[in-house]
Amino acid sequence: MLGLGTLARKIFGTPNDRKVKSVRSLVARINELETEFQALSDEGIKQKTAEFQRRVQEGGESLDDLLPEAFANCREGARRALGLRAFDVQLMGGIFLHQGNIAEMKTGEGKTLVATFPAYLNALAGKGVHVVTVNDYLAKRDSEWMGKVYAQLGLTTGVVYPFQSEEEKKAAYRADITYATNNELGFDYLRDNMKASKEEMKQRGHFFAIVDEVDSILIDEARTPLIISGPSQDRSDLYTKVDKLIPELVEEHYKLDEKTRNVTFTEEGNEFLETRLHETGLLPEGQSLYDPESTTIVHHVNQGLRAHKLFHRDQQYIVRNDEIMLIDEFTGRMMRGRRLSDGLHQAIEAKEGVSIQPENVTLASVTFQNYFRLYDKLGGMTGTAATEAEEFMEIYGLGVVEVPTNRPVARTDEHDAVYRTAREKNDGIVASIKEAHERGQPILVGTTSIDKSEALSELLKAAGIPHNVLNARQHEQEAQIVADAGKPGAVTIATNMAGRGTDIQLGGNVEMKVMQALAADPTAHPDEIRARIEAEHAEEKQKVIDAGGLFVLGTERHESRRIDNQLRGRSGRQGDPGRSAFFLSLEDDLMRIFGSDRLDKVLSTLGMKDGEAIVHPWVNKSLEKAQAKVEARNFDIRKQLLKFDDVMNDQRKAIFSQRLEIMEAEDLSDIAQDMRYQVIDDLIDMHMPPKSYSDQWDIEGMHRAVMDKLGLDAPLAKWAQEEGVDQDVVRERLCEAADRQIADKTAAFGPETMRSIEKQILLQAIDAKWREHLLTLEHLRSVVGFRGYAQRDPLSEYKTEAFALFESMLNSLRQDVTQKLAQVRPLSEEEQQAVMRQFLDQQRTAAEAPASVPQPQAAVAPQPAPELVGADNGESQPQAWGDVARNDPCPCGSGLKYKHCHGRLD
C-alpha cells in the first residue's frame, strides 16, 4: 500500500516536477522562434543584440519579457560559432539560472553551454555578468570556447586570472561577460577597497553571477575566508624551538578529537609543558602558562601541536622546492601561494625542516558566503546539489531544480562492498580492477588523499596493472590524464575530485587526439587527420560500451554524500552505459569515526568472514544515515560561523562604503571639519564634564589634550577665569581656532593640495584603523566562546562587544585624522611629489599583492600602508628618536625614508 506522501506525489508530482513543467511553455516559445533566427545573417544576429540592448537599457523592457527572443538568438549564435544546438533541457537549465536558482545537471549535460544563455540575456542590461569557475584553467578554457559564441552575438568576453596587468584586468571586468575564479573575484573586491582612487578600482559592481560547481564554492569552501595580509615580525627561531618540544609529548599530554579535527593539551600536558618551557628558557622563571604574558608562547605551542597531530604530509600538504604546498581537500589540487594563518603554516614549516616564512597580519578579509551575497542575483550549476538544498535556500536564497537529462542515465550504481580490514578491501579493489581492465573496461578509482592514491598505485604495480595517477603531484598532466581515462582498459587513480570540470569521454577525447596529431605532423591536412581519428575513436568507443562503459570505483566514503555522488556522476554521461561501486572497510576514517553501533549490529547479523565483503542495502542505509548526521553538523557549524561573520560583514560594508564615498568626493573639508568638532566635543566632555563648574575642570589635562590632538596652544586657564565662560563658549572658541589653523594651512599649501592631503590622510587612517579593528575582532572571536561556560550567549556577547569596538575605532579614526591634519606642514614641491609617489606605490603594492585562501584562515603578502605625509611628530627632538634604521620611515612623519630625510649623510 502506498503511503500518503507517495500517493500525493504520484497525483500532483514533486515540487521539482512542477518547476520543470512551469518552464516548458517558455522552451516551446524559444523553439517556435528558431526558424526566424536561423534566417538571419551573421550581421543580423549582432543587430538583434543591439536592438535587445536598446529595449532593455533605454526602453525599460524587462529581461523576463525578452527571454524567448534572447535565448533563440543565443542558440543560433552557438550553433554557428561552435556547431552545437542546445537541447531543450539545456534551455531549461538556462531559464532556471536566470531566475536565480541552482540548476542541478548531471555530468556531460553541457553546463558550459547552458551558462551562455542567462549570461547573454543578463549582459544586455549593460551591468556586466560574472561566470565563476573553480580554477584558472577552466576560466581560461571556457572564456576562449564560449567567447566565440558571445563574439558571434556581438558581445565582448573577458577572463580574470592571477598576476594580470592592471590594464588587462580592468579590461576584463569592463567586458560584457567576465570569466573568473571565485578566489580572484573575492581578492579583487578586497584589493579594490584598498585603492587610493576610484579610477584604480577594477570591478564595476555585482549585478549577476553564474557559479559553476556551485556546491564546491558555496558549501565546501563557505567557511574559507579570503584574506589579504601583510608581513609581521620574524619569529622563525621561536617556531623551531617549540617544534623540538612536541615529539617529547606522550598520549596522556593531549586529547585528539578526529570528529571535530581538534587537539588540546590535558592538565598533565600543561604541567609537562610548563616545566620544559622553563628549562628551555622560553618561559621566564616564576611565570606560569596561565599568566596573560604567556599568551604568545601558549599560542605557538598549540599551533605546533596542531601541525604535528592534525596535518600530515601527502594528505593536507606536500613538500616541494623547500616549501609547504597545501592540498585542497575537496579537489586534491595543490593550492599555490596559499598559506595557513595564525602561525600554523610556520609551525608546519618548522616540523618539516623547510625555510620558515614570516607570519602575516590581516589587511582585509571576506568569506565566500558574504562575497557572493553582494550580487543582486545569483545562479549556480552543479551535478550534485539536492542533498544541500536546505542550506542553499537558507543562506543564499537559492532554490535547487533538478534538470531532466537529455537521455536517461544508464549507469548501474551497485551497493557498497564492506570488508573487515583495509588489507582485505585493497585485495578486493585490485581484483575488481584487474577483472575490468582485462575486459577492456576503463576504470576511474577515487581516493581521498595523495598517500592513499600512491599506496594503491604500488599495489597495482605489484599486480602488473598499467595505470595513471592523478593527484596534486601530477597537477600539470591533469588534462592529458583525464583525456586518456576513457580509453579501453585505462586505469586512472584520482584523489577526490581532481579533474572535475573535464568530461571523461568513452574511447578517449577526440579533440585532444586531433591536436596531438596535428602537433606531431604540422604538414598533415587537418580534415584528413580528423576523419582518421574520428573513425579510430568510434571503434574504441564501441569497445568500451561493449565492456560496460566507465567503471567508477570509490575506495572510501566521504563525509558528504554529495562528494560521493560527484564521483559516481563521472560515469554514465549523456546516456552512456556505466557502473559505480564503493569498496569500504571498518578501518576507513568515516566508518571508524562515525560508524554507528547500528552498523556493527547489521554486520554481525549478516555474518562476516575473513576476505569476504558484505553487500547489502541495509549497510548503504546505515552509512547514509551516518553521512546525513555529519552533513547536518557541518551545516550547523557553517550557519553559526555565518552569524558571527555577519557582524563583521555589516561593519565591512559600512567601512568600504564610506571609503568609496571618500575616494569619489572632490572636497572632504566638511567631513574633516565634522571630525574636528566631534573631537573637541569629546575632549570637553572628558575634561569639562556637563553640569560641572569651572573650578572643577581639568584645565591642565585639557590643555595637554588640545595641544596633542589639535596642535593649538589655547589659553584655557585664562578662559576658565572669565565671567560667563562655560563649555559651549570653550567649544566655540576652540572650533574657531581650529578652523583658522586649517585655513592658514590651506593658504600655505594651496586649496587643491590641501584637498588632496585631506583625502590621503582620511584613506590612510581608515585603512590603518580597519586593520587594527580586524585584528581585535579576531582576538575577540577566538575567546568569546568561553563565555558559554558562564551561561552567556557567545554570539550576543560578540555582537555587543564588536559594536562597542567599532564605535571605539570610529572615535580613534576621528582623533587620528584631526591630529594628522593639525600636524601636517608644508613640504617642498620635490618632497611632496616623492611622498605622493611612495604612498601610491605602497597602496598599489598592498592592493595587488598575491593573496591567499586559508584552511581555517590565511594569506600572503602586501606591505602595510605607509606612515603619513608631512606630519610633524616631534621633528624638533631627533635626539629622542633612538636608533633608526636607514631604510625605515623617518620619525619626523615626512613619509620619506630616514636616509633621505633626517638621516641624510651630508
From Swiss-Prot:
GO terms for biological process: intracellular protein transmembrane transport; protein import; protein targeting; protein transport by the Sec complex. Keywords: ATP-binding, Cell inner membrane, Cell membrane, Cytoplasm, Membrane, Metal-binding, Nucleotide-binding, Protein transport, Translocase, Translocation, Transport, Zinc. Residues 846-862 have a biased composition (Low complexity). The keyword Transcription regulation does not apply. Transmembrane segments: none annotated. Zn(2+) binds at C890, C892, C901, H902. PROSITE patterns: SECA (PS01312), SECA_MOTOR_DEAD (PS51196). Part of the Sec protein translocase complex. Interacts with the SecYEG preprotein conducting channel. Has a central role in coupling the hydrolysis of ATP to the transfer of proteins into and across the cell membrane, serving both as a receptor for the preprotein-SecB complex and as an ATP-driven molecular motor driving the stepwise translocation of polypeptide chains across the membrane. This is Protein translocase subunit SecA. It comes from Cereibacter sphaeroides (strain ATCC 17025 / ATH 2.4.3). The gene is secA.
